């Protein structure tokens, strides 16, 4: 019925529409081979790109590597992924950009980015911050809706974003946008829509700023530019207070 579901988790009687019909289609964002069979090769290629294996900090010990319960909880949810492809099928970004790694691959990446035994965290988040990576996610949450397990890919993507910022991997539009967004809310309790686009591309990224010019001019002539001076908002200090409490 237009969404990816696991047949083993659904009762047919709950899926029939008003005409007592269930629509079956191949998984989305994958090339059909025959009937409902699709080619999973691009899916696995994306998973392999994130290096879904441990790259340890040190030589293998004589016994197993130890992890505390707290350390394991960071990767527990991602470990529940069964690679069913449901999130990949319904991803809106993959529908328009085949270079996007996709929610399944990025959820698998978080499994190793935050693994306390892995020694390549910085290298991983640098690779994942490139075009097609974490910052190309549109935050629609469709992957979470489709995921049949606690993996919740979008939550895993957000965790990689947090690690990337903590590691200082901020020289990209996505990270700059997130930092500008947070700075604006922290300082004024609202979004400064005039400065955020500029800070997102970078003050000294002249090509990026030039690319913004046509959009800015169209907005200006259509009267769509945000005002320079905003009207005051009642209790805006509460927004700043909430932000500060969450930021602690």
Report residues per predicted region.
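Hydrophobic/aromatic-rich structural module bridging two neighboring secondary-structure elements via a short loop
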Residues: 1-28
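Ferredoxin-type iron-sulfur electron-transfer modules in oxidoreductases and energy-metabolism complexes
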Residues: 22-30, 34-80, 85-248
